């Protein structure tokens, strides 16, 4: 199982006079102000890759925080005003210099992945909200001046409820049309549950759910400490499983998805959060959500 957690570049945070990882919304807003005042307009405490591509982190936290989302039945139980509040919350992070406006990010990077952007590599973007299995990808991308500052942060509780969620990071299955069922089952057993296979797999696709496989991978030193640390924090915070419709490609597709359209419209100034609500709800209803 995997989920999202915050990663921070404490090298940059220290330059801004901040010595501890953000643990609250107040900490994030204070960091945005400190970065702008002490480091300049082109330094930001964090980036939400989820806004332009797959915003399956902050919005569910807003929903669950209010006790309004039902990830089991894919029913949207919140009002237009409440989802506007969620969109306005994300906009407030841009307005508070916590993260870069998407227009500026696209101008500098086009559709380049965040960990490959110059801003991340050089520490100008000093945080990311990402999958626990991606820890080493973001750590190894930093240049030599910033690499030692990479830190697995804490989940930030934005309200009365834990908004964390998890999903399967990788699953293997045998199809009904498989012509070699026994052989396929043997391969899955080898990769996930047997010593040699589990030692090869390690934590490359996330922390193994198999107790036997995890034990073999740990004994072989194949479980990366950063990934294990991040996963433990995510699982301790998680209260919900990911709604399977939330990652529907019509919603999350890069360049064409509803999520990107909504946040682009807000960040480019074409719509207010209140005006963007109908487009988001219409898009979610079109893929199977029930609007209560």
Predicted features and spans:
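Beta->alpha turn/N-cap motifs
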Residues: 129-138
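Bilobed periplasmic-binding protein-like "clamshell/Venus-flytrap" ligand-binding domains
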Residues: 37-51, 97-100, 194-204, 287-291
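Periplasmic solute-binding protein
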Residues: 1-20, 48-73, 95, 166-174, ...
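Glycine-centered hinge/linker elements that transmit conformational signals in sensory
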Residues: 31-33, 75-108, 156
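Long, aromatic- and glycine/proline-rich binding clefts that accommodate carbohydrate-like moieties
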Residues: 153, 202-260, 265, 292
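Extracytoplasmic/periplasmic substrate-recognition and gating elements
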Residues: 96, 142-209
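Short helices/loops that flank or line small-molecule/ion binding pockets
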Residues: 13, 30-37, 110-128, 261-269
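A structural signal for short loop-to-beta-strand junctions that line the ligand-binding cleft
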Residues: 1-12, 44-45, 155-164, 240-249
């Amino acid at each position: 199982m995997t989920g999202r957690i915050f990663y921070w570049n404490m090298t940059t945070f220290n330059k801004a006079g901040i010595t501890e990882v953000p643990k609250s919304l107040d900490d994030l807003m204070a960091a945005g102000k400190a970065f702008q005042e002490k480091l300049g307009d082109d330094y930001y405490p964090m980036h939400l890759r989820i806004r332009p591509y797959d915003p399956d982190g902050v919005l569910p936290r807003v929903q669950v925080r209010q006790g309004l989302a039902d990830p089991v039945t894919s029913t949207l139980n919140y009002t237009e005003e409440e989802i506007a509040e969620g969109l306005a919350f994300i906009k407030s992070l841009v307005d508070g210099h916590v993260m870069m406006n998407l227009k500026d990010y696209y101008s500098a990077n086009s559709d380049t992945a965040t960990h490959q952007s110059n801003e991340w590599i050089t520490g100008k973007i000093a945080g990311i909200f990402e999958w626990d299995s991606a820890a080493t990808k973001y750590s190894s991308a930093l240049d030599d001046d910033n690499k030692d500052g990479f830190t697995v942060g804490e989940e930030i509780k934005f309200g009365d409820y834990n908004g964390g969620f998890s999903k399967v990071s990788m699953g293997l299955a045998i199809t009904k049309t498989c012509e070699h069922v026994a052989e396929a089952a043997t391969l899955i057993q080898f990769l996930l549950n047997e010593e040699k296979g589990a030692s090869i797999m390690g934590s490359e696709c996330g922390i193994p759910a198999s107790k036997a496989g995890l034990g073999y991978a740990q004994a072989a030193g194949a479980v990366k400490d950063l990934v294990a640390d991040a996963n433990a924090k995510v699982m301790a915070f998680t209260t919900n499983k990911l709604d399977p419709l939330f990652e529907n490609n019509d919603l999350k597709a890069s360049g064409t998805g509803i999520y990107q359209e909504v946040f682009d419209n807000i960040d480019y100034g074409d719509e207010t959060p209140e005006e963007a609500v109908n487009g988001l709800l219409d898009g979610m209803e079109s893929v199977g959500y029930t609007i209560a």
